[in-house]
From Swiss-Prot:
Membrane-topology annotation of the record: Peripheral membrane protein
Protein name, as recorded: ATP synthase gamma chain
Subcellular location: Cell membrane
Function: Produces ATP from ADP in the presence of a proton gradient across the membrane. The gamma chain is believed to be important in regulating ATPase activity and the flow of protons through the CF(0) complex.
Entry similarity comment: Belongs to the ATPase gamma chain family.
Originating gene: atpG
Organism: Caldanaerobacter subterraneus subsp. tengcongensis (strain DSM 15242 / JCM 11007 / NBRC 100824 / MB4) (Thermoanaerobacter tengcongensis)
Residue stretches in coiled coil: none
Amino acid sequence: MGKRDIALRIKSVKEVRKITRAMYLISASKFQKAKGMLDRVRPYYYRVQTVMKDILLHTGEVTSRYLEKKDVPEKQDKRKVFLIVTGDKGLCGAYNHNVIKASIELIKNEKANLKVVGEVGRRYFIKKGYDVDRDFLYTAQNPTVDLAAEIAEILLKEYNNGDADEIWAVYTEMKGLSQKVRTLRLLPLDVENFMSIAAEEEEAVEEHVVIDSDMIYEPSPSEVFDAIVPEYLKGLIYSILVQAFASEHFSRMVAMDGATSNADEMIEKLTLLYNKLRQASITQEIIEIITGASV
């Protein structure tokens, strides 16, 4: 490889480094934005959970179409809907791969309809022949409460109409700076699982809510519970979308930071090689001049 080739390669790597560095900075900004969004929604979401938790703990037996019925024989051929949240783009490490892999393991041979948020997951599952809702077209970028409300309404409609017996979510959970793919059944609610989620949220908020155990719910605890579940689901889906959004950009930050570091190392090695060749060339010229002068 000559000096000219090395110089061109150094220039090319520097251009790539500019791109990876810019992508890192953009993802860092979006990651911080997502963390702020999550912190703002948590208090409201926590209060809705607190009321539901109180109804379940202190009002006796609650009957609701949204609660799992333990005494009813389990259906053999359940119709399941899976809300799968991936990214719209790649270049974010194993983020998309991990969500897709967990989804495949969960679905297996189930009779399932997939509602996929994010272009990467949508393209993959359509290509592999899964039953993907083609009209469910939502981006993973910049999640909003209105978007979460739309998705919650679609899922509730299918559940209430009997088109779905179970609704699941597969997404990447963000806790601090750690990530893990989580599979969660949204409906029907499992009381034990719901209490566990409520306990996790209680740890995450600063201001705890205490409800009088003698609280009377009108017209009835069951009706109040049924009225609150859609709000709970909207808050939960918003939390899922924001955590996935934060996870995607954190993964991209890590990937782009690694790519930038690799580019720096390559530039350093190529520059060293270029200087060696340049030095050798200069030395050769000096030798030729001295040799010529002595003749």
